[in-house]
């Protein structure tokens, strides 16, 4: 099966504040870098945007995709079943409060279903080449806001 590796990261200058996201997609010898920014956002939103935009950048379906992220928020929502629980519980968390960032989680769901996506935690700022590159892309995107 064809496999794509994705690294993602989000960053915020203040939380909330100006934020950016970056992603590196790799397929064999091919690589693509993407990034974006928002003037008023949170770090968690930027972490999710990085994953959403990376998955949107993939053409077609039926891919085996491995997403590496340093976001415990994103990784735990997938690996620990939070996302499924939130949907089942009418988008309420374990405290019976509205789930934060519902708009992004709802945008992510069909993208996760389109391909076979596995997520893996990478330790942030630990020297991982691709995580560091994504962080740089996200921070450069923030600077582009002016």
Curated annotation (Swiss-Prot):
Cofactor or coenzyme needed: Mg(2+)
CDD domains per the UniProt record, alphabetical: RNase_HI_prokaryote_like (cd09278)
Cleavable signal peptide: none
EC numbers: 3.1.26.4
Gene3D superfamilies referenced in this protein's UniProt entry, alphabetically: Ribonuclease H-like superfamily/Ribonuclease H
Record has Hydrolase as a keyword: yes
Stored InterPro entries: RNase_H (IPR050092), RNaseH-like_sf (IPR012337), RNaseH_domain (IPR002156), RNaseH_sf (IPR036397), RNaseHI (IPR022892)
One function term, GO molecular function aspect: RNA-DNA hybrid ribonuclease activity
Keywords: Cytoplasm, Endonuclease, Hydrolase, Magnesium, Metal-binding, Nuclease
RNase H type-1 domain boundaries: 1-143
Compartment list: Cytoplasm
Entry binding sites for Mg(2+) 1: 9, 47, 70
Cellular component annotations (GO), alphabetically ordered: cytoplasm
Pfam families on file: RNase_H
UniProt cofactor note: Binds 1 Mg(2+) ion per subunit. May bind a second metal ion at a regulatory site, or after substrate binding.
One of the GO BP terms on file: DNA replication, removal of RNA primer
Residue runs in coiled coils: none
Reaction(s) the record says it catalyses: Endonucleolytic cleavage to 5'-phosphomonoester
Residues holding Mg(2+) 2: 9, 135
Top-level EC class as recorded in UniProt: hydrolase
Highest taxon, organism lineage: Bacteria
Subunit structure: Monomer.
Function: Endonuclease that specifically degrades the RNA of RNA-DNA hybrids.
Family designation: Belongs to the RNase H family.
Name by which UniProt lists this protein: Ribonuclease H
Organism for this UniProt entry: Syntrophomonas wolfei subsp. wolfei (strain DSM 2245B / Goettingen)
Lineage: Bacteria, Bacillati, Bacillota, Clostridia, Eubacteriales
């Amino acid at each position: 099966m064809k496999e794509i590796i994705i690294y993602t990261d989000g960053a915020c200058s203040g939380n909330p504040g100006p934020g950016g996201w970056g992603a590196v997609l790799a397929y064999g010898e091919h690589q693509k870098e993407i990034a974006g920014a928002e003037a008023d956002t949170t770090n968690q939103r930027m972490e999710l945007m990085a994953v959403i935009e990376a998955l949107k950048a993939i053409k077609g379906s039926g891919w085996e995709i491995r997403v590496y992220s340093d976001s415990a928020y994103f990784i735990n929502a997938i690996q620990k079943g939070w996302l499924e629980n939130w949907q089942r519980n009418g988008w309420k968390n374990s405290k019976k409060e509205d789930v934060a960032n519902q708009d992004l989680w709802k945008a992510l769901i069909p993208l996760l279903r389109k391909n076979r996506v596995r997520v893996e935690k990478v330790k942030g700022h630990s020297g991982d080449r691709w995580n560091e590159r994504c962080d740089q892309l996200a921070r450069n995107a923030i600077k582009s806001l002016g």
